[in-house]
Amino acid sequence: MLKLLLLLALSPLASLVHAAPCPVKQRVGIVGGREASESKWPWQVSLRFKFSFWMHFCGGSLIHPQWVLTAAHCVGLHIKSPELFRVQLREQYLYYADQLLTVNRTVVHPHYYTVEDGADIALLELEIPVNVSTHIHPISLPPASETFPSGTSCWVTGWGDIDSDEPLLPPYPLKQVKVPIVENSLCDRKYHTGLYTGDDVPIVQDGMLCAGNTRSDSCQGDSGGPLVCKVKGTWLQAGVVSWGEGCAEANRPGIYTRVTYYLDWIHRYVPQRS
């Protein structure tokens, strides 16, 4: 069985054993990356859970002035109370300029059970729509026809570990790294390397997307954050950080929830922007 590097596979309560205010270990830190420019990634958000303070536990993305997209394993199957969560919009350094927003409701995909089973996707509705500006505005969702072919250069962002067991240090800057898309069938073969499961048992499913290599990858630290790609001059969200084995390890690309696979479900709740 794959050793998943997730502490939030079932519930954000698992994160609360960590000392504050260090970023909590989930999937997605940035390996091989650098600090992001303050003018970039205006859709990036930090999700917070109430502990002794509002602790960062996952990333997310603003996809509409009133909606945030994240991973289902961040929200959990059993925590239904939106008052336990807060959202911090684009922030260069965690905790240094917090203006936390309240959440009206959480919506977890009904088919989610574990990250390996897929459907690792969730929505948070904000109580009040945000004021869109050059510093804060939503990321565009891709058309259903967009495939993000193998080799496409995309970007993943977050506040997580910078390598296996190497946490991001204060002042906790937002990090970014460029990662190549890995075609699903190739990614699946890579994940079968060294395992005894039969090749006919898929690990990487249609609703998943792979990206990364031994030089650049997501790591522990910010599950739920966005994987974005620039297509014909427009930034599109290709994936949601979900899971993986290790950080930038051979034959183990990062695995993301494929946004196009869940567009119909997203738009049951989130109005389409013109």
Swiss-Prot record:
Query: Enzyme class, one word?
Result: hydrolase
Query: In the Enzyme Commission scheme, what number(s) does this protein have?
Result: 3.4.21.59
Annotated GO MF terms: heparin binding; peptidase activity; serine-type endopeptidase activity
Any single biological process term in GO: proteolysis
Task: Note one Pfam family from the annotation.
Answer: Trypsin
For this protein, the record's InterPro entries field holds:
Peptidase_S1_PA, Peptidase_S1_PA_chymotrypsin, Peptidase_S1A, Trypsin_dom, TRYPSIN_HIS, TRYPSIN_SER
Q: What catalytic activity does the UniProt entry give for this protein?
A: Preferential cleavage: Arg-|-Xaa, Lys-|-Xaa, but with more restricted specificity than trypsin
Q: Which residues carry this modification: Phosphotyrosine?
A: Y96
Q: Which SMART domains match?
A: Tryp_SPc
Q: Which cysteines form disulfides?
A: C58-C74, C154-C229, C187-C210, C219-C247
Give the chief site where it resides. secreted
List GO terms (cellular component aspect). extracellular space
| Residues annotated as domain Peptidase S1 | 30-271
Top-rank taxon of the source lineage equals Eukaryota
Signal sequence region: 1-19
Tell where it localizes: Secreted
Q: What this chain does, per the record?
A: Tryptase is the major neutral protease present in mast cells and is secreted upon the coupled activation-degranulation response of this cell type. Plays a role in innate immunity.
Q: Which family does it belong to?
A: Belongs to the peptidase S1 family. Tryptase subfamily.
Subunit-level organization: Homotetramer. The active tetramer is converted to inactive monomers at neutral and acidic pH in the absence of heparin. Low concentrations of inactive monomers become active monomers at pH 6.0 in the presence of heparin. When the concentration of active monomers is higher, they convert to active monomers and then to active tetramers. These monomers are active and functionally distinct from the tetrameric enzyme. In contrast to the hidden active sites in the tetrameric form, the active site of the monomeric form is accessible for macromolecular proteins and inhibitors, e.g.
Q: What is this protein called?
A: Tryptase beta-2
**Species assigned in the record:** Rattus norvegicus (Rat)
The organism's taxonomic lineage, starting at the top: Eukaryota, Metazoa, Chordata, Craniata, Vertebrata
